[in-house]
Regions:
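Active-site-proximal helices and loops of the catalytic beta/alpha 8
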Residues: 1-97, 143, 160-192
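Conserved glycosyltransferase catalytic-site signature
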Residues: 4, 137-138
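Aromatic/acidic polysaccharide-binding cleft in carbohydrate-active enzymes
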Residues: 37-38, 99-125, 141-180
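A broad, low-specificity signal for short, low-complexity segments enriched in glycine/proline
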Residues: 56-63, 111-117, 133-136, 180-181
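Aromatic-anchored helix/helix-loop segment that forms the rim or "lid"
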Residues: 66-70, 76-79, 117-137
Length: 198
């Protein structure tokens, strides 16, 4: 209850300062209790986007700590997970949910496409780059840019940056060495997103 009261007070202060401000929370699990219109507006969409997309397209857990053959390419599991978790989001929360493929905590999506379980603490950084699948990355981008929500690109994903989970996922941006084909694909998909919305 204290947590809920804090967020109600927080929302009141924020909305008084700027009624248009968006209160977006990082949350794992069902956020429904905080999305009743008096606390958060939306969430970083792990459960209804990042995790199901990752399992479906790569079979990997988002930290690259586990590979699950039973979830790789399993359309029933993907659809069921998406439907189940999307139910906990009101329409306005769904359309503002932060749909990420990668972020500052998890392995890069492009690295997950190589289906290699590992972390940089016991594997070389080069292992995160070996055998990545750009076709799968493009499939993920297409889903990200056409799915309901706010597609959020973690810096470097558009340029082909790889990396296992934190801290390897925080590599520097490859200025002048970007993957031009991937960058071009991102631009095309962003244009489609802007034109038709999600």
């Amino acid at each position: 209850e204290f947590n809920h009261q804090f967020w109600k007070d927080f929302r009141k202060a924020v909305k008084e300062a700027n009624p248009e401000a968006l209160i977006l929370a990082e949350h794992y699990g069902n956020p429904e209790g905080w999305l009743q219109g008096d606390e958060w507006d939306s969430v970083m969409n792990y459960d209804a986007f990042m995790e199901p997309v990752t399992w479906f397209l790569t079979g990997m857990e988002k930290h690259s700590d586990e590979y699950r053959e039973d979830l790789y390419g399993n359309s029933d599991a993907f659809i069921n997970a998406m439907k189940n978790h999307m139910r906990s989001l009101h329409m306005s929360a769904l359309h503002t949910a932060m749909n990420e493929l990668s972020n500052h905590d998890h392995s890069r999506f492009l690295t997950r496409t190589n289906r290699t379980v590992g972390r940089v603490s016991y594997m070389s950084p080069e292992a995160a780059e070996r055998n990545v699948d750009y076709a799968v990355m493009r499939e993920a981008i297409a889903i990200q840019m056409t799915w309901p929500g706010a597609p959020t690109v973690y810096y470097g994903d558009e340029a082909g940056v790889c990396g296992f989970t934190d801290p390897d996922n925080r590599r520097t941006y490859p200025w002048g060495r970007e993957n031009k084909e991937l960058l071009s694909f991102y631009k095309k998909m962003i244009a489609i997103h802007k034109k038709v919305g999600s």
